[in-house]
Structure formats: C-alpha cells, structure tokens
C-alpha cells in the first residue's frame, strides 16, 4: 500500500485490522516499525483512535509495545480471542551474536520458552510501516520467523526494487483531489502506475 505522507497511513492500517477481523475473523497483528520514535507515534495513534473505532465496530483493539521485560503481554496476545496488536521496532528482533535479542532466547521467567515461538504459533498478520527503512536482507529473514499469515507493507516511498503486489496507491494528486492534504506544489508531471 503506497500512501502519500500525511494522508493517514496509520489510521488506514488500523481500519484494515478491524475489517480483516470483521470479514475473516483474523485477530493477531504485529506492526513492525523502523525506530522507537515511529513506534511511539504509532502507539499514540492507537490510543487516540480507540474510541472512534470502538463506535464504528463495537469492539476495541488490545495493543501494546513489545518489551522483553514484560513477557506476560505475549501470552495474553497469543491466548486472547479479541483483536490484538503488538507494536515492535525492528531492532528488537534484529541482532545476532553476543547481542542476540531476548525474543529468541529460552527464558526462565517465560517457562523456558522463546517469545518468538509463541508469537509464530499465532500466524500473525505483519504490517510493516515504512518497509524501505526496515527490510534489509537480514530483517527479511527475521520477519519470516514470525510465520506470518501474510504481510502488508505501508509506505509513502517504497523502493523501486521492493514493490511486490501493489494493492492500493494514493499519490499526491489523488490525495489533493480527495482533500486529504491542503496544498501540493508540482515541479513536473510524470504519471506512474495507478490503482484507480
């Protein structure tokens, strides 16, 4: 999904979660973000849109930020039948060697289980926010360890070599025409693929 900056990418993928739950019953989602700052912004978006979506869908999403010191959240994520979202920044699962992350370790305080195994058993839907900042080769391999049902990638600027199955594209002109942005400035025009 390609959406112009400032047009509601986070809102759109939260609504997508509700729709996927409503239509197919899917309830496990992991939002992968490139940085702590974006992670905090995404968390805030979940907070401020919670009542709005509860009104529309008559249910709430249970969301949390992955924290290797609060592993009970992962158990709750796996066992709860409601819509559950874990927000995680790529650094939390993307180190190896002596810096190996706790998500891959058998932990005494987690009944000698590995957090990644519990998450993978849920076959979550991965939502990657700004994939061009997240999807290096090592990260792509690590993402597979979540055993996702499928992956949705949301960005304003997908890299040309990493566009897979584009299902929606909201470019600057369309965003302006839909009154999603106040003003655009055009230096030159070149139209590339549209899903309209």
What is the role of each PLM region?
Residues 1-196:
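RecA-like P-loop NTPase motor core of helicase/translocase proteins
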């Amino acid at each position: 999904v390609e959406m112009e900056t400032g047009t509601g990418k986070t809102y759109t993928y939260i609504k997508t979660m509700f729709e996927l739950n409503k239509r197919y019953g899917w309830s496990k989602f992991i939002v992968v973000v490139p940085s702590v700052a974006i992670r905090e912004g995404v968390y805030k978006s979940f907070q401020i849109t919670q009542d709005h979506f509860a009104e529309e869908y008559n249910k709430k999403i249970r969301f949390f930020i992955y924290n290797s010191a609060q592993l009970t959240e992962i158990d709750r994520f796996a066992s709860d039948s409601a819509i559950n979202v874990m927000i995680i920044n790529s650094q939390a699962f993307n180190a190896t060697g002596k810096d190996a992350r706790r998500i891959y370790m058998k932990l005494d305080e987690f009944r000698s289980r590995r957090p990644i195994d519990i998450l993978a058993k849920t076959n979550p839907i991965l939502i990657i926010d700004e994939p061009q900042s997240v999807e290096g080769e090592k990260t792509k391999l690590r993402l597979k360890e979540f055993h996702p049902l499928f992956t949705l990638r949301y960005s304003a600027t997908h890299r040309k070599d990493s566009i897979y199955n584009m299902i929606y594209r909201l470019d600057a002109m369309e965003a302006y025409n839909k009154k999603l942005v106040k003003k655009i400035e055009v230096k030159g025009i070149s139209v590339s693929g549209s899903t309209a």
